[in-house]
């Protein structure tokens, strides 16, 4: 008769074979970075927290605002906030002077009322960090106080172009930017600030906003 025999063999454990740690959730105001790794042999998952939670941050593109009566602007915005944070509320101290309607991402619409005067806008983050911005509403249009981000000197090769991107302060200024070249045969500039090099030589590009002016000297090779 055939004899059936069962043989049992013990295979020694080889241990876990974990993958390298992988970040599955970035560091935020609520927690450090969440990382995990998985064993390729048994599928076991391990999780760990790396680093501390982020410190709340609230930065804006203007420390204060000027507006003409009835003026509306969307130019005021948050320029930096910590990962995981967002704006919880936008509050005006006097809605007869100024109103604000904002979003969690840091953008907003600010509108001046019919009255002149001063008010404050308070921004509160989910992290409870707060910032207050002063707003002044006036009768006159908001005039330019400075023109920035324009190079003093510029060199271009013939037939090449360059786009000027002046930054006007305050951000609520409604005066138009005007561009003028001292020599159209050397360098042209259109109403949007695009310079086109025509032929070799030098010219001056004047950028003006209201009573403020700045000049860029351009050399064409």
Feature annotation, model-predicted:
Residues 18, 29-34, 40, 44, ...:
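Extracytoplasmic soluble-region selector
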Residues 23-27:
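Short, recurring structural edge motifs at helix starts
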Residues 1-7, 14, 39-46:
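Short Cys/His-rich metal-coordination motifs, predominantly Zn2+-binding knuckles/fingers
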Residues 7-11, 20-22, 46-50:
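Linear, non-domain "peripheral" regions
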């Amino acid at each position: 008769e055939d004899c059936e025999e069962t043989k049992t063999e013990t295979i020694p454990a080889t241990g876990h074979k974990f993958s390298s740690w992988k970040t599955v959730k970035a560091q935020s105001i609520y927690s450090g970075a969440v990382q995990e790794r998985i064993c390729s042999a048994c599928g076991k998952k391990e999780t760990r927290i790396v680093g501390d939670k982020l410190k709340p941050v609230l930065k804006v593109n203007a420390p204060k605002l000027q507006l003409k009566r009835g003026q509306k602007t969307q130019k005021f915005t948050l320029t930096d906030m910590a990962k995981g944070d967002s704006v919880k509320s936008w509050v005006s101290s006097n809605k007869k002077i100024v109103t604000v309607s904002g979003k969690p991402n840091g953008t907003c619409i600010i509108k001046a009322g019919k009255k002149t005067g001063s008010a404050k806008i308070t921004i509160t983050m989910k992290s409870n960090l707060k910032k207050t911005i002063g707003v002044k509403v006036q009768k006159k249009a908001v005039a330019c106080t400075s023109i920035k981000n324009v190079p003093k000197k510029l060199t271009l090769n013939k037939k090449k172009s360059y786009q000027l991107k002046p930054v006007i302060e305050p951000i609520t200024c409604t005066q138009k930017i005007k561009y003028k070249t001292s020599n159209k045969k050397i360098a042209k500039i259109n109403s949007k600030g695009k310079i086109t090099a025509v032929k070799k030589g030098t010219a001056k590009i004047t950028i003006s906003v209201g009573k403020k002016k700045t000049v860029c000297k351009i050399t064409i090779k």
